[in-house]
Amino acid sequence: MKKAVINGEQIRSISDLHQTLKKELALPEYYGENLDALWDCLTGWVEYPLVLEWRQFEQSKQLTENGAESVLQVFREAKAEGCDITIILS
């Protein structure tokens, strides 16, 4: 089981968030750092099962002007489509 940890205290922008996702999920170099690219990777690249632990989510949400909420929604949609993702927010 793969575990990806996002530390919200270290996320200062949506770019920081995408770079963290790229590292934690071992996304390809050509990852486009946008919601469509994230969806493509979640539904065709990432190995499952996956545990996403997002620490200090509310802080990262504020610092990314709700960009973090949009990213979280992509993970929730991928889960609804059958991707084996466990999401832990703290």
Swiss-Prot record:
Q: State whether keyword Cytoplasm applies.
A: yes
- Give me the Gene Ontology terms describing cellular component: cytoplasm
**Keywords on this record?**
Cytoplasm
Q: Note whether Cytoplasm occurs among the keywords.
A: yes
Taxonomic superkingdom: Bacteria
Q: Where in the cell is it found?
A: Cytoplasm
Please explain the role this protein plays, according to its UniProt record: Inhibitor of the ribonuclease barnase. Forms a one-to-one non-covalent complex.
Q: What is this protein called?
A: Barstar
Organism annotation:
Bacillus amyloliquefaciens (Bacillus velezensis)
